[in-house]
Amino acid sequence: MDFLGLPTILLLVCISCFLIAAWRSTSQRGKEPPGPTPIPIIGNVFQLNPWDLMESFKELSKKYGPIFTIHLGPKKVVVLYGYDVVKEALIDNGEAFSGRGNLPLFEKVFKGTGIVTSNGESWRQMRRFALTTLRDFGMGKKSIEERIQEEARFLVERIRNTHEKPFNPTVFLMHAVSNIICSTVFGDRFDYEDKKFLDLIEMLDENERYQNRIQTQLYNFFPTILDYLPGPHKTLIKSIETVDDFITEIIRAHQESFDASCPRDFIDAFINKMQQEKENSYFTVESLTRTTLDLFLAGTGTTSTTLRYGLLILLKHPEIEEKMHKEIDRVVGRDRSPCMADRSQLPYTDAVIHEIQRFIDFLPVNLPRAVIKDTKLRDYFIPKDTMIFPLLSPILQDCKEFPNPEKFDPGHFLNANGTFRKSNYFMPFSAGKRICAGEGLARMELFLFLTSILQNFSLKPVKDRKDIDISPIVTSAANIPRPYEVSFIPR
């Protein structure tokens, strides 16, 4: 036998070294989370029930444990099921899990700017600025709390003018909540009949409807295919672009009338930052537009839907409404507006508001995260940029923390002596570094709007209370209340 030539020997040595290095790398990385075998291109889509994703995830967690992998189309997703593992990821390893999962639909619209869908330094700077600016001070002459109190008075007067006639409260609540964003971001509220305001509300409502469609969600996992097909995803993109144009107009007007010595609102604060830090490439008109758009899209539908769902639940449970009336009358009375300082003296009312958020479980799947580096979670390796679903529903519905979680019970947030009970499992705003930037604003709105309504009105259903259905309409993204009408009876 001829001896192997030197080039052949060198080639074999190189291949051997490569294989050893690859083996060592794999062994050091460890195994990735288990999961069902995906079908090429399609993934595990047919193994999931789009109308009851939580039940599908529950069954998969029983088989594979609290950390498992699914494939949505060609995209790999690691699902985290249960409080312990979600806390371990989002809080204990917050930096590693601080990325936002890549969503092609919103990438088309936001182009990596704003707060909700951006990543890296852009996200850090926009979030830090928004949190600082939205704090309850330094926003012109009125604090955010005062703006909400003022809007609550307008809402109460508008409800009073219905003269006890039954109506669907959706529009009233959406107008009130949207006006808080308008007041904070644009510097002033709109009259409820203002044509420009009504057009904005219609666009926001349309966005919410189309965003909850299953075809829209599928676009994020099959963008190449759905780009060639008509559907709600294309309507949503056009609708968001229309809101974008609306905001751009207002920003242009602000730039023309801007006075650095007298900032009026969020937009002025941003323009001031742009002028102070001209070398900072993250503070641009485009990023201002997208950040403002974020505040509207994230801050209007979620809060108004929670209020609407809360009123429906109180229609079903008049005994809970009555306890809230008595507590509000005792602490606040009828001669002044409720304020945030009252909350600590209203433990039952506070517990009801927390229970509304827990019970409705508005975003069961949560907004997707991503790991920003190769990460180990328990015994598993998760490669950089992997999309993460840190599920909220199993936490808010945990039967050990909240006995009989399917039942609406303010006692879930009350101690035996009637004081308010905090729970680490209360995560409707998510958790960790990506916790909702508008959490503080939303909490204020929910408390001040609901207490103001109940201070002034009793709720009267249009049908027998036993026929009121408080189970949600489950969409592909959110749980929303069933349509209903209510009469507001002055107290």
Swiss-Prot record:
Q: Where in the cell is it found?
A: Endoplasmic reticulum membrane; Microsome membrane
Q: Catalytic activity, per the record? A: an organic molecule + reduced [NADPH--hemoprotein reductase] + O2 = an alcohol + oxidized [NADPH--hemoprotein reductase] + H2O + H(+)
Q: Which gene encodes it?
A: CYP2H2
Family according to the record: Belongs to the cytochrome P450 family.
- Name listed for the protein in its UniProt record: Cytochrome P450 2H2
Chief subcellular location: endoplasmic reticulum
The keyword Nuclease is annotated on this UniProt entry: no
Q: What is its EC number?
A: 1.14.14.1
- Output a single Gene Ontology CC term carried by this record: cytoplasm
Q: Does the keyword Endoplasmic reticulum apply?
A: yes
This protein's UniProt keywords: Endoplasmic reticulum, Heme, Iron, Membrane, Metal-binding, Microsome, Monooxygenase, Oxidoreductase
**Gene3D superfamilies from the xrefs?**
Cytochrome P450 (1.10.630.10)
